[in-house]
């Protein structure tokens, strides 16, 4: 039977990042992905590398600080994949978040970024408010501009996987884990690929299956306790409208949430929603489409991309594509808006050779991978490192 130090289940950004970090630390690594790399949420996110300005409202300062540090690192390590982008926040007379609140929030955002090169913001003069064609100017009192970053999430995931491969990690696509037998010295896995059923023994196993994390735990013997989760779907629409000159940070006209209008390969991308779902497979709903188009129409009711007033039918005709990513959040009451977004690492006393990742953010994947690798080293001991992940360029 094949023997390795570490097996990872899941080929999203978290899984490939753990593969890279662990391989750099000197461990032998096999990653099993039942489909293709970045087939799930890691290709269906909002494409942003950002601190999460809105998380300040729920007091998640540590998460914002960590995310801003991660943003700085990725701009350095992946300059061809992660690009600084201007963000714009229009403020209207009826906005829930007034100019003073936003100025305070942006000041704190800059402080938490340690005033790096993207940590500054400014209030734009009224003559600059028309830089977004068709954006509603009636009732606007301020427009703030700050900086964050954008990426192609699928390409970034594949770049991390390529780096892991160069370090010796064996990444296998089309390989579905079927059973997991936890033993005192590791885990015995059965999996299926194009050549049939196979077996693998690892000294440590990381469950990075994303939305399917508990489904994978159900295949473990002896049985292991699962953490209660909610599946929260984030949907996006790609519109056949010329890309805006930056990212617009807009208050929803329907609730307290924030929605982004973003440039994406020359077109306009709008998202995201937060819809509680009953299962791990995302599927955009008519309500989500109406929600996103309604917000766009509220702010761009006289867009220069249309003749006359913007109707719902005209906007629907502009939809080129849609996609939905699935988040895993701690189970709770009410909507998902204020729930914690930090990744959770679970390692049960009954199953010390198995670590499960719940949640995670695209921006902070490197910090997650380092934390997981530190847990691996506590069980397996340290190896002679092959590389310093803080110096490995991506892309």
Regions found by a protein language model. Name each.
Residues 1-14:
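Beta1/beta-strand and adjacent pyrophosphate-binding region of the FAD-binding site
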Residues 47-133:
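Dinucleotide-binding Rossmann-like beta1-alpha1 core, especially the glycine-rich loop
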Residues 155, 163, 221-244, 249-270, ...:
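C-terminal catalytic lobe of FAD-dependent flavoproteins
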